[in-house]
Each structure stands twice: as structure tokens, then as C-alpha cells.
């Protein structure tokens, strides 16, 4: 699977905000929260969707499949309206259940956010 996550960041009144949504698909990540996701059928599509924004690409191995994931930071003046997402304070992100893949990538971003 080829996953492309976008971490939208918007600063307002000295607070940083982002968008997340809760997964409802019947898989191991059901009920976990994640950033805005686009999924691609193959590597060519995934590579073609790359942007010049700060990003981290990684491979995550599950027991039954290999996930190729890219997380891209997009700093915006206004958060986009995206169905099924919620706007939260970045400082409250730890109150939401995230996948191990997402947590590991956030650690790698470190001071970029």
C-alpha cells in the first residue's frame, strides 16, 4: 500500500492547529486517528504526488503487508475544509490514539513542527 499523509498546520493566536480524522475502515487501525490521507495503487502514482514541502517517507512492515508512507507538512494560513476531519490544537494531539507508524514519524520530524 502507498500512503500519503498531509499534516496541515495553521497558527492562530499563538496556537498551532491541525486536522485529523478517525478511521472507520475494518482494519487494524480502526478507531485510531490519522492526518489527512491519500492512498495510491502503485509507486508511480505515489511518487508523482510528491511535493516540495517538508516530508518524511518511510516503510512500515505489518505482519501481512508492507506500507510505504509519506508524511508531508503543509503550513497554511487557513485550514482547508475536508470532510470527516476535525480541527484540534497541536498541543492536544497526544489525547488522540494514533498508529505506531504516525508516532514514529512525528518523533522523526522533531523540531520541524
Which residue stretches match the model-derived regions?
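Intrinsically disordered, low-complexity, charged terminal extensions of DNA damage-control enzymes
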Residues: 1-113
Amino acid at each position: 500500500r502507498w500512503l500519503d499523509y498531509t499534516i496541515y498546520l495553521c497558527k492562530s493566536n499563538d496556537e498551532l492547529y491541525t486536522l485529523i480524522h478517525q478511521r472507520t475502515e475494518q482494519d487494524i487501525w480502526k478507531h485510531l486517528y490519522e492526518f489527512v490521507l491519500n492512498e495510491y495503487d502503485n509507486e508511480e502514482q505515489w511518487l508523482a504526488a510528491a511535493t516540495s514541502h517538508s516530508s518524511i517517507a518511510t516503510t512500515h512492515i505489518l505482519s501481512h503487508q508492507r506500507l510505504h508512507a509519506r508524511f508531508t507538512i503543509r503550513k497554511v494560513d487557513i485550514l482547508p475544509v475536508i470532510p470527516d476531519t476535525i480541527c484540534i490544537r497541536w498541543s492536544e494531539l497526544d489525547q488522540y490514539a494514533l498508529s505506531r507508524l504516525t508516532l514514529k514519524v512525528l518523533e522523526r520530524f522533531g523540531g520541524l513542527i
